[in-house]
């Protein structure tokens, strides 16, 4: 029995020694031994082979009855505006048949609206050999099945223990390091050590995700005293960005593991955590942000203006609060490659631990980060217009769909004002067309 215990201790020590020597230490120093690159090369070749096998295995492709206009689309929509579509049926006056237009739009929204589908995982064009994404894919060949089984063994018996070890090291180092640094008096030494801890631990955590991050246009990286705004897909967005530079973060208070990390990191760095439902918290956040931006020696602030996680196919409405405090805005676009793993956090379905387990049993996290030129509020431009301009720039750069809807619809009911807006538009159309119809022949309305 003692021999088994000694063997287990020896194996554990050997395992940790290899992890520290080959992964943790190089990550902390910001160097790579080429292990991640070799793994990604093998993974890409395997998925390419699997895609070819799947395409060959489809003997009789099913006829496509409907054109799919966008990702995750299952119905064909007519995007003609209300006024043009109804005017094409008749002119000027109300007709009972107009009801059918609104009924059709209602049925389309029930079957597939453009908002709620952004809160579920993106559908893949080709299967990536993960069980959780094989809804639309079926048995093709024995060879492909064998490769899938080998993949399951590799992911759960080798990658999961390795990633769990790295995550435990990274999170523990983050909590302990920031707690210790937080005891130091405010000053340049504390700020320097805080940046070292955040940067080092973020690099280890990226390795725990088998992360391959491509940073573009580094000359546009956020500067001190500025505000960095980015589209939001997952809590790991912050790790992805901190892997290349440190930020003072602003975000919602969380419980559980996330809460422990938040309470530890705020001791060493001026992060701002708040409760969105508390009005006094929001006023306090605005005040803190103004003070932070006024000091050009402080770290740039990292804000996700959508306020919730979106599935990385679109960018939804930016809250205007981040754009009211002044200062220079540094937009950042983040785009994940779903072929290697789904980075989206469906917080209404999975807690943070379940989400991390799904991430750690995926193949890898691959994403592109684009630093964009700084933007400032134009003269005569209000906060909402400025927010929309920044959102449009991020959507274009990341190849994402731009949606005007509030991400808060993920949990809240649709406001009555949205329904009333459709009624107002229809009423205005009837009044305008009716006025035009009452004009004498040969005249035009203004």
UniProtKB/Swiss-Prot annotation:
Pfam families, alphabetized = Acyltransferase
Q: Which GO terms describe its biological process?
A: CDP-diacylglycerol biosynthetic process; triglyceride biosynthetic process
According to its UniProt entry, the function of this protein is described as: Converts glycerol-3-phosphate to 1-acyl-sn-glycerol-3-phosphate (lysophosphatidic acid or LPA) by incorporating an acyl moiety at the sn-1 position of the glycerol backbone. Also converts LPA into 1,2-diacyl-sn-glycerol-3-phosphate (phosphatidic acid or PA) by incorporating an acyl moiety at the sn-2 position of the glycerol backbone. Protects cells against lipotoxicity.
Its pathway is: Glycerolipid metabolism; triacylglycerol biosynthesis; Phospholipid metabolism; CDP-diacylglycerol biosynthesis; CDP-diacylglycerol from sn-glycerol 3-phosphate: step 1/3
**UniProt short sequence motif HXXXXD motif, positions renumbered to this chain:** 232-237
What Gene Ontology molecular-function terms does this entry list?
1-acylglycerol-3-phosphate O-acyltransferase activity; glycerol-3-phosphate O-acyltransferase activity
Q: Which family does it belong to?
A: Belongs to the 1-acyl-sn-glycerol-3-phosphate acyltransferase family.
Highest taxon, organism lineage: Eukaryota
State its location(s).
Endoplasmic reticulum membrane
Record protein name field: Glycerol-3-phosphate acyltransferase 3
- Which transformation does this protein catalyse, written as a reaction? sn-glycerol 3-phosphate + an acyl-CoA = a 1-acyl-sn-glycero-3-phosphate + CoA; a 1-acyl-sn-glycero-3-phosphate + an acyl-CoA = a 1,2-diacyl-sn-glycero-3-phosphate + CoA; dodecanoyl-CoA + sn-glycerol 3-phosphate = 1-dodecanoyl-sn-glycerol 3-phosphate + CoA; sn-glycerol 3-phosphate + hexadecanoyl-CoA = 1-hexadecanoyl-sn-glycero-3-phosphate + CoA
The record's keywords, sorted A to Z, are: Acyltransferase, Endoplasmic reticulum, Lipid biosynthesis, Lipid metabolism, Membrane, Phospholipid biosynthesis, Phospholipid metabolism, Transferase, Transmembrane, Transmembrane helix
User: Taking the first listed entry, what is the main subcellular location of this protein, grouped into a coarse class?
Assistant: endoplasmic reticulum
Where is region (Disordered) located?
A: 418-446
TM spans, by residue? 25-45, 142-162, 164-184, 352-372
Listed under GO cellular component are:
endoplasmic reticulum; endoplasmic reticulum membrane
- Membrane topology category: Multi-pass membrane protein
Q: What class of enzyme is it?
A: transferase
Species of origin: Gallus gallus
Q: What is its EC number?
A: 2.3.1.15, 2.3.1.51
Q: What is known of its domains?
A: The HXXXXD motif is essential for acyltransferase activity and may constitute the binding site for the phosphate moiety of the glycerol-3-phosphate.
């Amino acid at each position: 029995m003692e021999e088994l215990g000694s063997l287990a201790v020896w194996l554990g020590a050997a395992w940790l020694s290899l992890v520290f020597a080959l992964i943790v230490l190089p990550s902390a120093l910001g160097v790579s031994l080429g292990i991640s690159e070799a793994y990604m090369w093998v993974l890409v070749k395997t998925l390419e082979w699997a895609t070819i096998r799947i395409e060959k295995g489809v003997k009789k492709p099913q006829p496509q009855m409907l054109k799919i206009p966008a990702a995750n689309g299952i119905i064909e929509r007519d995007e003609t505006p209300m006024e043009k579509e109804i005017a094409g049926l008749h002119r000027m006056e109300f007709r009972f048949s107009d009801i059918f237009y609104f009924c059709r739009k209602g049925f389309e929204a029930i079957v597939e609206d453009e908002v709620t589908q952004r809160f579920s995982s993106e559908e893949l064009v080709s299967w990536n050999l993960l069980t959780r994404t094989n809804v639309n894919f079926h048995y093709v060949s024995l060879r492909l099945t064998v490769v899938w089984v080998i993949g399951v063994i590799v992911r759960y018996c080798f990658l999961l223990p390795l990633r769990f070890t790295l995550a435990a090291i990274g999170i523990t180092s983050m909590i302990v390091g920031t707690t210790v640094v937080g005891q130091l008096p405010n000053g340049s030494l504390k700020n320097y050590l805080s940046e070292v801890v955040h940067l080092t631990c973020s690099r280890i955590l990226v390795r725990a995700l088998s992360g391959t991050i491509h940073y573009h246009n580094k000359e546009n990286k956020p500067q001190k005293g500025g505000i960095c705004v980015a589209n939001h897909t997952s809590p790991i967005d912050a790790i992805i960005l901190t892997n290349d530079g440190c930020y003072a973060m602003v975000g919602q208070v969380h419980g559980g593991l996330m809460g422990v990390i938040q309470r530890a990191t705020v001791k060493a760095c001026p992060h701002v955590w708040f409760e969105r439902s508390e009005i006094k918290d929001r006023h306090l956040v605005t005040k803190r942000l103004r003070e932070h931006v006024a000091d050009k020696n402080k770290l740039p602030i990292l804000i996700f203006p959508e306020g919730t996680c979106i599935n990385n196919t679109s960018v939804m409405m930016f809250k205007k609060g981040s754009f009211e405090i002044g200062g220079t805005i540094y937009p950042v676009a983040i785009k994940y490659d779903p072929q290697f793993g789904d980075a989206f956090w469906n917080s209404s379905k999975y807690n943070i631990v379940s989400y991390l387990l799904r991430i750690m049993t995926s193949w890898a996290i691959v994403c592109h980060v684009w630093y964009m030129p700084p933007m400032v509020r134009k003269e005569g431009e209000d906060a909402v217009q400025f927010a929309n301009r920044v959102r449009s720039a991020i959507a274009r750069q990341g190849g994402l769909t731009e949606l005007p809807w509030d991400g808060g619809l993920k949990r809240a009911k649709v406001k009555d004002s949205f329904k009333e807006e459709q009624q107002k538009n229809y009423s205005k159309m009837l009044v305008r067309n009716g006025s035009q119809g009452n004009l004498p022949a040969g005249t035009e309305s203004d």
